[in-house]
């Protein structure tokens, strides 16, 4: 029986290590693993070389509704849903797999900072779980996008089908510099 407990602890520490490497904040680590806070802080310092950042997690569904953040959040959530249907894993494991796939698709050869960090991806799943955010299909392209639940009954056009002018400016600026 003790062997099982040691293996469980190793499994939890491995999850914590993967989460730290992917950029998780302490609140995510404490919520998703059974490792003590003291050990998590030590692990964080060993892996990152600095103490974990202090402060509260972002708490606003509005962040996920801005055009660029919405596209990235929706892409991540669609990957997550696909993995959730095909894999029989713990939700945190599915989150990590989906986040890695998101990074592969959006940043294959780049060292840029991702639009959607792991902590925000985790927060998105929590918002969806408590009903603050839902998924809806675009009426033009039929792609699945995240949106605030209170507007779910209204017709919806995604920012890929109808990009805001600032998105077009950003795209022309980045394509002109390449």
Curated annotation (Swiss-Prot):
Keywords, sorted A to Z: Activator, Bacterial flagellum biogenesis, Cytoplasm, DNA-binding, Metal-binding, Transcription, Transcription regulation, Zinc
Principal location class: cytoplasm
GO molecular function: DNA binding; zinc ion binding
InterPro entries per UniProt: FlhC
Superkingdom of origin organism: Bacteria
Location in or out of the cell: Cytoplasm
Protein name: Flagellar transcriptional regulator FlhC
Source lineage: Bacteria, Pseudomonadati, Pseudomonadota, Gammaproteobacteria, Enterobacterales
Gene name per UniProt: flhC
